[in-house]
Regions:
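Short amphipathic alpha-helical patches
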Residues: 119-121, 142
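Structural signature of tandem-repeat unit edges
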Residues: 2-15, 22-40, 52-91, 101-114, ...
Length: 142
């Protein structure tokens, strides 16, 4: 996991939904849990350059304990090149990677079972979707 990573998140059924990621790495490895909640969802437009307004219950958390001012740069849009999701992520919401034109790869675990619409719209460099699972492990793929 990245040592310098800030995350805007909210509680959701079963754990935490990541709404926005901040830091200096174009290839973040997202945390397995946030404040004791397992990360189970990636929210709508999470990595999109332009985002809709955030919900009132959104909270900020960082790996190193620094506040939001220490993370002025979102990992979004043309900056993001690859993302490693925690193995427990079950859902990728609509347009989570919308207009991430330099996104080359995404690594997800076998818990993934729901993928929203327009997830990879305009992700022209995307050439690898890595499903990190044992060959005989059950996956959400149908």
């Amino acid at each position: 996991m990245n040592s310098s990573l800030g995350i805007l998140w909210q509680a959701c059924p079963g754990g935490a939904r990541i709404l926005r990621v901040f830091g200096d790495s174009p290839c973040p490895a997202l945390p397995v849990q946030i404040e004791g909640f397992p990360v189970v969802e990636i929210g709508p437009y999470c990595f999109a350059q332009n985002q809709r307004s955030q919900p009132a219950d959104a909270r900020f958390w960082s790996v190193d304990g620094r506040g939001p001012a220490a993370y002025p740069h979102p990992i979004a849009g043309d900056f993001v090149q690859g993302v490693t999701l925690p193995a427990g992520v079950r859902a990728l919401h609509n347009a989570a990677f919308y207009n991430c034109r330099k996104l080359e790869w995404l690594c997800a675990g076998s818990a993934l079972e729901s993928v929203g619409s327009d997830l990879f719209t305009n992700c022209r460099a995307l050439d690898r979707f890595i499903l990190d699972a044992a060959p005989d492990a059950p996956t959400g793929l149908k």
